[in-house]
Amino acid sequence: SGEPEAETVATALSNKAPAGYGLGAAAAPVTDLNQAVLSGWYSCAGSSNGPSSNFYGWLLVSSRTGAGGMIRQDAWNALGQPDHFVRYAVDGVWTPWEYVNPPMQLGVEYRTVEQYNSKPVYAKAISFGQAPNATYKDVSHGIENFSQLVSYTGMMGGANLIEASGVDNIQINASNIRITTNTDVSANYVYLVLRYTKTTD
């Protein structure tokens, strides 16, 4: 029939994915992520210069050599939530680690892979507390070196804050969030996610 025998196919495919990774070899251990500059797949166990101190996880390195050579590192942590981080080295200078999809814990600032006007975008989830009763309420967002608001989303009582009929106005400046309501919605709690740039970049 012209079809290859099953044994022939199995032999041709054997050892094409050593250790099951499909990346040419098992992950090589690395103790300092700054030293992982050759393209490859690495394992980290208490490694330095990772997204966290004593980083445990995996690292994928893509390296381009030559003039203006660039290295990209993608890291995934093995402990806790499986977060994905990215950073680059251009001419030997490393950028900070950035989140691809931050876990958005309340009150924590995350530097993301997004850019706005060639500046990194940060994200922070904020608990505003109870909505105001037919008045306005100011809450500090606690962001240092706030530069430009890029976008925001919000929930009030489990519904979209921006489209809520009881909300007249939402104002966000370098220090505070102000929400103005036209009726008593104080039984509802408000949560917002701000995306912004910083003056330090």
Residue spans for each PLM region:
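Glycine-rich, low-complexity segments
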Residues: 1-39, 90-123, 145, 201
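Short, compact, well-ordered microdomains
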Residues: 83-93, 182-191
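Extracellular attachment/recognition segments
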Residues: 45-53, 57-65, 119-201
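Coiled-coil-like amphipathic alpha-helices with heptad-repeat character
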Residues: 11, 82, 106, 190-193
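Glycine-rich, flexible loop motifs
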Residues: 13-83, 90
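Intrinsic disorder/low-complexity segments
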Residues: 7, 11-13, 18-20, 29, ...
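A generic structural motif
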Residues: 76, 88-89, 114, 155, ...
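Short, surface-exposed charged micro-motifs
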Residues: 84-86, 112, 169
